[in-house]
Amino acid sequence: MKKSTATPAPLPVPLWRQQLHYRLKEGALIAVGALCLYLWMALLTYDTSDPGFSHTSNVDQVQNAAGRAGAYFADILFMVLGYFAYIFPLLLAVKTWQIFRERHQPWDWSGWLFSWRLIGLVFLVLSGAALAHIHFHPPASLPFSAGGALGESLGDLARNLLNVQGSTLMFIALFLFGLTVFTDLSWFKVMDLTGKITLDLFELVQGAATRWWEARNERKRLEAQLREDEPVFKAAPMAAEKREPAKPSLRERILKREEPPAQPVEPREPTLAREPIVPPRETAPEALAPRETVVPRQQHAAPTIVPPSAASRAPEPSKRAMKEKQAPLFVDSAVEGTLPSISILDPAEQKKIEYSPESLAGVGQLLEIKLKEFGVEVAVDSIHPGPVITRYEIQPAAGVKVSRIANLAKDLARSLAVTSVRVVEVIPGKTTVGIEIPNENRQMVRFSEVLATPQYDEQKSPVTLALGHDIGGKPVITDLAKMPHLLVAGTTGSGKSVGVNAMILSILFKSSPEDARLIMIDPKMLELSIYEGIPHLLCPVVTDMKDAANALRWSVAEMERRYKLMAAMGVRNLAGFNRKIKDAQEAGEVIHDPLYRRESMDDEPPALKTLPTIVVVVDEFADMMMIVGKKVEELIARIAQKARAAGIHLILATQRPSVDVITGLIKANIPTRMAFQVSSKIDSRTIIDQGGAEQLLGHGDMLYMPPGTSLPIRVHGAFVSDDEVHRTVEAWKLRGAPDYNDDILNGVEEAGSGFDGGGGGGEGDDAETDALYDEAVQFVLESRRASISAVQRKLKIGYNRAARMIESMEMAGVVTPMNSNGSREVIAPGGPRD
């Protein structure tokens, strides 16, 4: 048995002493603040006619607002420090406020630190008084020079030795040194803060100017449009039969260049992103008809089909991205408690427009022709181009079933000479059918452009996930806490591992280790091992599946512990628990652990702290289920059923989406799924309960099924390179070391180190690692009771330790597995254990 080398924990401070400590600091702040105000009032109302140490006066009426004592105090300060006497009370007030701001920290007296602070104050006062004497003339109202007696003696001595310029330089250096030591001021932080404030002011002025300029241009455009439309409306009462219809625009002439003669049953030419279908226009007898149909339709089409000028513009960056544009002045700016800058990621490329409205209209015409060849009458209603695919929304003719169009997906892909075509049978809120055709030149979605959006910056959840862009190029941001678990599946090369890395980096760029912690299980030993050493990890990256089973078992135990803690606190979820703890800390109160069991009357329960959200990431849980067996499926089901309110979430990824891996038990408890490209429609139905994933393009193209809906959303996943992951990991390593919980993996040896897929005896190892295992077996054999609570009461140990002992006995053949009613039977013969 290994000897424990843990140092004994310090005795907790009694609650009454903590409360007294807080109140004394508050009282000291009030007293020193009142003293500083009194001194300042005395200095501001100083009068030479009042009595003082530097002169004599016999007046009966004191002019000083602070009274006779204030007159003496002001005279002493002016006599010693001169003009610097005005600064002295301010220094005391600033230092007192700094001490009060740390009132919740335990009091730790350090004589060495107090000496340094006193030395800093002395240097600050002496150098300030000397500078005042050198550069200011003494007025008649002061008893001595502008720097007082101290400033006069030091200033004259330094001026004789170093001249005025040398003396000024020396005293400025001493003043800054004293200010830094006394107030603990970092000039590097001051420079960084000054730069950020300057940048914010510049952005504010620039934004105001941009908004004014855009409003001015919009006003001019509206005025020009009104002037253009005014003659038309005035001429409307004229005889319409004598006027020619208005000349169509260049865009309409291009779209109608190859249009066949209008027939009542023929499909209409697609008008890009227009309103619902209207009957074909035969003639325009009224003079006003062309303007009433063309102009509003062009205005409505602009938000749907993105013109090249609008698509080339980058999305508006978030406030965080704008602030982080300023490069850090010093390498050591990565301090603990800050988040890495988004600028360490690769910037997004300038996207070029590879299409035109004419080319999109041509593809729409070809789509109508090909469907007509297969006996399906449709009309293209609107076109929605995106970075990777373009969606053509078609309106089927009366009597055409959507299933006929869906069955023609492969035939359309062959006819259009593209990789694949996906048919969207139902578009929420529309009567059209979507046909998604890949673009000839695919654009890459960079991870940095998704993180730099205001949608990601405005999310408050510590487990916010940035997935990528939808088919229209808009960012897709979701919250893992609302899922609350995620199932990811896709074949090799579909972008599944890159998608998992993007989710992990989304958490790392959003949360500190106090807000979110990670447990990573990597059977491949390559995908997640790169994150080894970041402070968010609760344990080292798990690569052994025996350790993985114990990590899940610890997660279940932690879930149960949090539920008991929240029930004792009277809250319903982790957010309410953390809010209650923070409110108590701000009020200067301490909430003790209600579940703490005292071993003696002198024991004080520890103070509660906020609990972080825990995310368990499994890169390939198919391999884990093959090695460990059905036990892992039960643990995953328990976590998925109950862990949402406890703040524990699962991200399960696999490249083998078969029914023996993604079982019905797992699917029933994890409704949020994400399907990358798969090889068959059966695999697609296994993941998202419908087809479509087999028609994806790969390389990050996915179907994301949000919680609470059965309609998947097509998302183009953001690309994360290995260099970006390395830079992010190194940035977090500079901010702190990981604080591992040894109970997560050490329990594997106690719970059954001979876990070989489904059997194996771990009895010898358990007896060697746990000194009480033999006593537990002897108690079970003698009492014939295989109860965890009985072993816990008999040996006076914790519940988790007793449960591991019972599980070890089950593996060794001492007791039977748990029956349907939760009980076990002792099958080994009675008597002491050999």
Swiss-Prot record:
Entry remark concerning the domains of this protein: Consists of an N-terminal domain, which is sufficient for the localization to the septal ring and is required for cell division, followed by a linker domain, and a C-terminal domain, which forms the translocation motor involved in chromosome segregation. The C-terminal domain can be further subdivided into alpha, beta and gamma subdomains. The alpha and beta subdomains multimerise to produce a hexameric ring, contain the nucleotide binding motif and form the DNA pump.
Gene coding for it: ftsK
Domain FtsK: 473-685
Gene Ontology terms, MF aspect: ATP binding; DNA binding
GO biological process: cell division; chromosome segregation
Amino-acid positions noted as binding ATP in the UniProt annotation, renumbered to this chain: G493, S494, G495, K496, S497, V498
Keyword Transmembrane: yes
Basic and acidic residues biased stretches: 240-272
Keyword 4Fe-4S: no
Subunit relationships: Homohexamer. Forms a ring that surrounds DNA.
Pfam families in alphabetical order: FtsK_4TM, FtsK_alpha, FtsK_gamma, FtsK_SpoIIIE
Descriptive protein name: DNA translocase FtsK
Localization per Swiss-Prot or TrEMBL: Cell inner membrane
Keywords: ATP-binding, Cell cycle, Cell division, Cell inner membrane, Cell membrane, Chromosome partition, DNA-binding, Membrane, Nucleotide-binding, Transmembrane, Transmembrane helix
GO cellular component: plasma membrane
Ranges in the topological domain labelled Cytoplasmic: 189-834
TM region(s), chain numbering: 26-46, 73-93, 118-138, 168-188
Function: Essential cell division protein that coordinates cell division and chromosome segregation. The N-terminus is involved in assembly of the cell-division machinery. The C-terminus functions as a DNA motor that moves dsDNA in an ATP-dependent manner towards the dif recombination site, which is located within the replication terminus region. Translocation stops specifically at Xer-dif sites, where FtsK interacts with the Xer recombinase, allowing activation of chromosome unlinking by recombination. FtsK orienting polar sequences (KOPS) guide the direction of DNA translocation.
Region Disordered: start-end pairs: 238-318
Protein species of origin: Pseudomonas putida (strain ATCC 47054 / DSM 6125 / CFBP 8728 / NCIMB 11950 / KT2440)
Membrane topology recorded in Swiss-Prot or TrEMBL: Multi-pass membrane protein
Family classification: Belongs to the FtsK/SpoIIIE/SftA family.
